[in-house]
Amino acid sequence: MDRVFFTNSGGEANEGALKAARRYAYTKKTGRYEFIAMQNSFHGRSFGAVSVTGHDSYREPFEPVVPGVRFAEFNDLDSVKALVNDKTCAIILEPLQGEGGINLATQEFMEGIRKICDENGILMICDEVQCGMGRTGNMFAWQGFGVKPDILTMAKAIGNGIPVGALSLIHISEPTRLQLIS
């Protein structure tokens, strides 16, 4: 992680990650724009972030939300595979869900998501707003799985009480990375 884009909050970091994924697909001329998110997830209260949040109670008051978002069961690779299509640009997940209970991704699930993304040209977004910054024993939860995401979001603990968030485009080449966040 050699470059970080700072934001005002975790929700804004996730909003930036969604925009970066769509911009990446646009730049690569893939025609992809859809997202797969997980049930019981929480990604923020901005319009894009609430659109990929896996709780009806957060989304319903703002419907219609961003189109092209489908929800898979957390820790169920078959559920994710069933949703992948030629329009999927990214899969967003929290390695450790906090809003839907303390749900930890399995090793098999994280490795499977990375494989699905690699085989289908899909970006993997890890939302570590709640679980990052040493809260799982590693600096970031993904490190414990040995599964590196393409985009990483973080907040809360990085500010030590000051509202700040950030996103990093990890596996995206330099020229494309600059286009996505400039």
Regions found by a protein language model. Name each.
Residues 1-90:
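PLP-dependent aspartate aminotransferase-fold enzymes
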